Structure formats: C-alpha cells, structure tokens
Amino acid sequence: MSDAPHVSVLMPVRDAAPWLGEAAASVLAQDGVSLELIAVDDGSTDAGASMLAELAASDERVRLHATLDGARGIANALSLGLAMARGRWVARVDADDLMLAGRLAMQAAALDREPELFGVTCRVAAFPGAELRDGMREYLEWQNSLLTPCEIARDRFIESTALHPTWMMRTEALRALGGWRDADWAEDWDLLLRAMEAGLPIRRLPDTLLQWRVHPQQATRNDARYSEASMMRARAHFLARHLAPIRNGRPLWVLGAGPVGKALIKALTLEGIVAAGLVDVDERKIGGIVRGNGHAWRVIAHSQLRDMSPRPFAISAIAGAQARARVRTELARWSWQETEDFVVAA
C-alpha cells in the first residue's frame, strides 16, 4: 500500500483469538475512507499471532507489530502502533469489539467539519446482554448521554467520559500531546484527562457505531490499573492540577462523607491538596471526624456550606446519576456555577 491512508486504526491484541477475526473484519469492511489496520500483538499466548499473520498475508491494509519481551501492556502496544501510523486520523478499536458500518467515514467527516476538535467518539451498544451488570449499564447510559465537548469535559472527573475503542483523533495532535503513557491508572482515562487539561475538545456523535463486547477476560475486569483504587489516584491527581488555578485560595470542601468522599479527601492530600472538610445531609455523619494521612476533617451540614462567606469551592463525591442530578439542582439554587464554584467527581 503506497499511498498514505486517511485513517490508521490501532488494534492492540492479547489473547483475543476467539473474537479477533470478527473484530478485524468489521474494520476492513469500513467504506468511505481509505484505512490501514495496525495490529500490535502484546505477548499473546493463543493463536492470535498466527491469525494476524494470515490476515496480513491476505490484505495489504493490515500491518503488524509486536511488543518486545512479551506482554508490555496496552499503552506500550498503542505507542508502537502510533509510531507506525501514516493516516491523518488515528482510530481505536479493541480486538474483541465490532465497528458498525460507516463509523470511520462518519467520524472523519466530523473532524473535517470541526477543525477545532481533537477527537470524535460515538455512542456504544454493549453485548451480550447477559454479561452486562447494572453498574456497567448505568455507566454506558451516562457516557452515551454526553454529546458536546462541554459535557464531556465537565464530567471527566467522574470516570472516563468516552470508551477508548470509540475514539478517532487527529494523528499529529495526538503525537503532540504525547500519545499514551504507561501510568498507574487506565491509559484511556489518562489520555482523556490530559486532552481536557490541554483544552483539546472531544465531541460524541449521536450515532451508535461500536458494539462493545462484555466478557470475563476484559482488561477492565482484570487489570489493576482499572481498579477503584487506581481510578481514585487518577481522579485526585488531575483534580489537584485542575483546582490549582481556579480556586483562588478559597477553602475546599468535599460533598459526601461516604466511602467515595472519604477516599477522595485522603487521596487529595497525596497530591498536596488538603481540604477543609466534608459535607453531608446524614444527621448521623454530621459533626463526626474523618481521619487519614495525618489529617482530621470535620463533617458539616450542607446548610453550613451554603452560608459560608466568602464562597468556598466544592467537589461533589456523591456517587450515582440521581445523586449527581440532585447536587447540581441544589447548588444551582444557591447560584453556584459548575466549574467556577464546584466540580462533580462521582
């Protein structure tokens, strides 16, 4: 393949033989854009490597690479793929998912229409339904509801606001950002948080263009970097960087004295941020003391927070879609502005 393709599709592969053929076929069936499929084998121990070799022999659009010394992790595999990419745009797909018809063409057209965008994502349908747990269903519903760059940026501290295999990005902008890092937390959320921090907007198309396969072998279920503890470290790290220029010295309060709020207020201290305390509506918690990392924080009622002057800054750590809606409604009644006076992080 001599001419540079429009899109370079990066597919990291590790022990995905049961699904690899379907996933690759869904990429190669895309029309409306020229493409290359860059498959990086990350230490597979199944038949995946031989399947990839057969695929490359039968289709010149398939280019192969492999990580050195066995499994090195998805960030390393993606970095190798990015170094090989020749396309104007880089799209992501996992070796167990399915691209739906028209995805690449629709995302490329969106990037052409809006040159200010760093990337474009899309809505997702998960399958098979029997493997989809209630928490994951709620997570996907929340993600799919976020369409505009402002919504995606606003909610970024809750969890990753876009499934990684739905992304398409401008290749040079991705390289300028530093590509993927091998961090102590999920590489996809790390990339998204760095993009948001750099002011790089991402839009979600309202179309469902990826089928996300849910199964027990998924990295999200088995890799420690996707654990709750790792996510909290990432959240605290990027929140601390975000808060530094916008708090203007105002006291910081964490809304919610439950497990998430307690974990967050402790994690923030490791990033050099010591909050004033926690806020709750539960009479059993109000007046209590939370201790950790050499600090002690009191728990106050939300009415006490409302009456403070000058106005403090708050991080909401009350988990769940309904709880988020209640927090936003209540703080709007106080004339607090999201991002200026508070952020939502659960």
Enumerate the predicted regions with their spans.
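N-proximal low-complexity "stem/linker" segments adjacent to membrane-targeting elements
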Residues: 1-26
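Short, acidic, metal-binding catalytic loop of nucleotide-sugar glycosyltransferases
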Residues: 25-34
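A conserved acidic beta->alpha catalytic loop
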Residues: 41-50, 71, 94
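Glycine-rich, basic loop-to-helix element that forms the pyrophosphate-binding segment
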Residues: 67-85, 106
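Conserved nucleotide-sugar donor-binding catalytic segment
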Residues: 74, 83, 139, 144-223
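Short aromatic/hydrophobic "clamp" motif used to bind/position activated sugar donors
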Residues: 90
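Conserved donor NDP-sugar-binding/catalytic core segment of glycosyltransferases
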Residues: 102-137
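Hydrophobic, well-ordered beta-alpha structural blocks that scaffold small-molecule cofactor pockets
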Residues: 157, 211-346
